Amino acid sequence: MEIEIYDELNSSDSLKQINGLSKLNQFWINQGRDPTLFFTSIIKLISETDNKTTRILCYSILKSCKCTPSDWSLAIPLLVKDLNSDDNEVVISILKTLPHISSIFTELLMMGNADFGPLVRHGNPSVRKTALDTLTSLLFYRKSILQSYKSFVSTGWELIVDRILEEPIPMVYQSSFSAISSLFSEISRSVSHSDELDNSVQKRQVLSYYADWISLKLIDHFDLLLNRAQHIDINQRHSTVNTLTYLVDTISRSSGTPFWPTSFDNNNNNNNNQQINNNNNNNNNNNNNNNNNNNNNNNNNNNNNQNNLINGISSMNLSSITGTTTTTTTTGNSPITSPTSPTSIIANTASSNKTKQISSPQNIVSILVEYFLSQLDSSNDSLVFAVGKAILDLLLTQQNQHNENWINPVLTAFIGLLRREGVSLNPLPILLAIMSVLPMLGDDLLFCTLSRIFPSIKSITDSNQRVSYLIRTFELIIDRHVTSSGKSSLFTPLMTTDCLLMAFQDESSSFREEIIVSMVASHHNILSKYIEIESEKNSNNNNSSSGNSGGGSGGSVKFSTSGNLFYLHQAALNISEVCLKCITWQSERISAIEYCIRFVDWLCRVTLSSSSSSNNSGNGSESQYGIKLISLLRSDLLDQINKIPSDYICLQAVFLICTHLLRSPTNKVYEQSDAGLLISLLRRRFLFLDNQPKFTQYNGNIRDMIMGVSQFGRVSPASLHSLSGYWLGALECLYLMGLHIPSVEATVQRTLEEILATYPHNKSVYSRARFIRRMLFSSTSSALDAQSLGKYSTIRNLNSFTNYTIDFSYCIPIEQLEASNSLHSISDIFAYECKKAITGLVGVHYGSSIRDKSSRDVTLISGASDPVWIEVSHTTHPTLNTITLHVQVTNVIHFSIKNVNIMIGLSGHLDFPYPQTNCKHNIPKLLPEKSYSFEVPLNVSSLDYNLVTFKLTFNQPSGLCESENNINLNNIHTKINNYQQSSDQLLVQSIQQQQQQQQSSSQQQSQQSQQQQYQPQPISSVNSGLSSYSLNSNNSGSLNSSANSHSISTSAVGSPGTASFISSSLLSNAQSSSPTTSSPLSNVINQNIISSSSSSSSNANQITSTTTPSSTTNSNNNTTSSSSSTNPNPNPNSHTNLNSIVGSGINQPIINNQIIQSLSITTNNPSANIIQFSPIEIRCSDYIFDWNQFLIPFKYNKHQFIQQWPRFEAVFSIDVVFEGFVSVASIFDCLSALPLHNVLNSEFGNSNFHFAFSSSTWFNEQFCFTISGMEKCLSFPEDYSIYYTSPNGQSLPKYKVYHARFEFRSSSSSLLASFESIIDQWINKLPRPTSDQFIARLLAPDEKSLFSITNITQDYQAPKNHQSLANTPLSNIVDDEIALLNQWKDFKKSQEQTKKLFSQLALDQDFY
């Protein structure tokens, strides 16, 4: 193909030239290859041909070339020549090429031909438009041009300003509008979207300087700009909004106060409408009003005019982010006399040769807003949203925040955008714009607006943004209720609207729970704000009270009868009335219900305590609030308590009623009946469950079913937790009722006695119930006096029992009481234990959405061929923001392993709950086929990028390292046989290579041995691990194990370089980030050789003949003294046992001779009995938490709402295969050649990567993508040469296949849909800047992506390899890994089956 294209490009026939260029574009560039190879032929073709089509094709191909500046210098004369060409299409093709070859921009400037003046004033409008677009892209997206060529930049902006004023064709000056709008948006936004996200102060200052200069140039031409904007096509007219709005705001700020007052009432609105309708008198009245206002505010504005101009330019946020929706709206009661009145007036002014402007600094805002209001009827969504957002921005910046004539049409248009049917979009940009207007609205209009936008709030895709918007909305409602002294109450009517009633009945979505949480969080935020205000007032008046606290959840706030806190109390009652309806919801997301229960508990403590004190003072309103709250507790909580589906919420509700309702004086009549109802509920649902076959506990819920014992006669009863959180909470509720309610003493005492009689063998439950009974009903005179039981209660006889120290001999601790030393009283100990019970710190967890189950399957993070397996799972606790990590360590070989250490590291937003958490776990001795389990508690503060790292170190297996009488290696043959086949071929090659070297250079070795008698072996130099070969003089050429982590590199054991090489290979294995797949036994053998070499080198002065290479074959005595041993007594059969370990395919005499010598036994050397073994270190795979595995509610305390426009709303993903002689670096170079910014670059080893790229385009056409890739394990020759053929016949090991998942995101769904239709062409056209020896393709129809394999459900069958390659080390390792993984899965399946056989809960589940 290359030769054919090259011949056609160098042909003299124009048709062949065009054909060659077409082939180059279709079969080369479209396949992602770099056409730089044909650069010389293309330059020659441009210089010689006169054919227009050929030249245009050549310039389009030059955009894809990656040449050096010296090569580009050949093209500069041709570019300069053709820029002055008479052919417009050639000039346009060169202009489109210039941004892609900006590296030669310096040469173009030096030659004086980079002046865009003649181009932007060209006679052809297409050339002028292309020149403006090219100039804009050079000014914005080329950082070097902005910094280095200041004269070119200033000249370029002058040309853009000149075209926006002088250009007659709308299609052309629309490009100038776009460029200036982009500049104004760039200096207004908080984060830059251009030039690689460069947010430096220097760049902002330079852009602000040009923006100020452009504003001064265009201020006098506003009428002309407004007239020109109306002639632009309606689909592109949104690009003019930023320019007009920025200019109007700058003019208005620099001139002073406009004619309207700061607040509007009905009379002012009517007068304003009359003034606008009378066009003749309008200007005079406005000028008179303005003169008066300017005279009144002269002293305030004279000193600030210049500052207002600068601050207005630098601080405005007027960027218009457009959406992809359509609407038809009406302007409502807008102050427009006729839709075409601004157009006609401005046209007349433009035709009168600028005799007198109709716009003045006082009425220029009104003129622009009238024009914008007329555009709200447009059918283009981008224009509707842009002008609506601009009107709202002018309302906020021009001190006209109550002009309903502006607000109503915009609200109508925006709600029309939100309620369009058949349009799928992210409504957050429109809702954020509406949020800025909500504080300006009256109560009626606010209620109507909120009721209409609530369905759109539900459609926000991101949960965090949805909850944040709800919090801001409810904060506005509560704040307005407080500031209006209770006159504005929107909670009750808003909650009775149809949209919210339907939301509360929808069980499939979490929107109703988010509404409940947002109400509670917003009240907490407003309360915190007003408490700070009240405390400041009290401190100023020197009347500060220590009783007020800043927290809304635990403080004892005393409400006064007048003031803000009093009306906040009213709002809290309204919220609790709405929230208590949620306790009967059938939902696993009970965090919202828990928020509600705790909020009502806080409100009861505040209200009922204040109402009891106000009854003494005679205040009736506070007692009325207390009566209302008691009635709410009775009607919405007590009457519905049997219908609460969640045991956890039910127990909290009982605790709430025992604490507040039963102790209220107004509830004396119903005290005994209510307490009896609660005690029966506790007995039936929580207490009498343990070891009773007729009651069954299933998934946390109790089913009261009576079944025959014979059905479950063979099954052991369900073993529940001895003292779970339910037990503790139920006993605490009994304690509260027995302590505070005398009328139910007999019922409580009888219940405790039945517990003691029913569960005598459950020591925890028995001791806890006995402790409560003695505290409540034992006599003060004598604990052994049975007649006085129940007459004199120990606790009630004491006036204050807070100082009463308890006897811990009555109370067995639940687990270990962390704060036992600081708890000295009965109330403290019970409050602490109840807190542990309610919040789930002890016993079963009852707040999680995944009950009593691990949040994901067990994951094997160690290598399947490692002697120690580490299996990890976790359980989330959403109500606590914690995770419990379950780690199981298993010894899978037949030898015990000593001193196993597991180091745990945290990354991301994970943390240990307290500093003394042990992150290092030590196992002194791990027996064969035994498991050791432990748990690690973790705190979670955020959901992104969380992972746990594991590092495993252990000593050599005791069967190989300890000094025993016999070495018997037959025991581990069954476990390790599959591990060692991978090193057969390498060992054979190395031994044959060494044998040849020994035969050919025996004389040279003898000479070297004489020199080495006085020179010790440099073993210490090996620890650096920098060299792939052994650091010895003869350099035996051993293989480097770091080149292939799957192979066991072994050289001749007799050579002196073996120890250094093996130590470097072990260091590389220990430092690798992926799980080790090498054999543990080979590491053991290599480690013994290392120790032997180290001991021999340490004793080099005593034994000088040990470093002689020839001694390995000539003298057995030298070899024996040079190597340390694992056995003081030699075993004559050890060489036969080693055959099963090392491999049977090795030459038998050689392996016997070498291995026996390396493991021979010495008794002559006294230092051989002291053996130093360094532990084996394994770095396991990271245990990664996905964001959806946490299910943790957000913390809403002082929630900060980020007002930032979302950048992306649409997304689609696709899997791509990179196949050939490819690497991670070549893939990154391939993607870096795209015109996108690399915002994330993460490489994990040589086989995994994660990149992210983002664009810098404008006006809601933003685009980004992330790519995650992993290397696929291949088996040759099946996986080779399917879609790609090697051009150079390279070797098979260099051939790789990477599976990558692209995830594309864009703020425009239509853009993403059009991009999706050409994704296959885009993949094929990926550039190849460095190497083109690989292809990028989509998945084949029968091909499965690696990303779609989330778990292993069935045994994976290894592909059948070719006969000639069946014994390769790589194929053996793959087979061994798969076999071990299948063995691990079988083991897990057998465990699950045994659990099902003996678990009554599982049988009950299957039965139902």
Swiss-Prot record:
Protein name (Swiss-Prot/TrEMBL): TSET complex member tstA
Subunit structure: Component of the TSET complex, a heterohexamer composed of tstA, tstB, tstC, tstD, tstE and tstF, which may act in plasma membrane turnover. tstA, tstB, tstC and tstD are likely to be the core complex members with tstE and tstF acting as associated scaffold proteins.
Pfam families in the cross-refs: Adaptin_N (PF01602)
Gene3D superfamilies cross-referenced by the UniProt entry: Leucine-rich Repeat Variant
Compositionally biased tracts (Low complexity): 266-308, 319-347, 998-1051
Family per record: Belongs to the TPLATE family.
Region (Disordered): 259-347, 998-1055, 1091-1139
GO cellular component, one term: membrane coat
GO BP: endocytosis; intracellular protein transport
Signal peptide: none
Polar residues bias spans: 309-318
InterPro entries membership: ARM-like, ARM-type_fold, Clathrin/coatomer_adapt-like_N, TPLATE
Lineage: Eukaryota, Amoebozoa, Evosea, Eumycetozoa, Dictyostelia
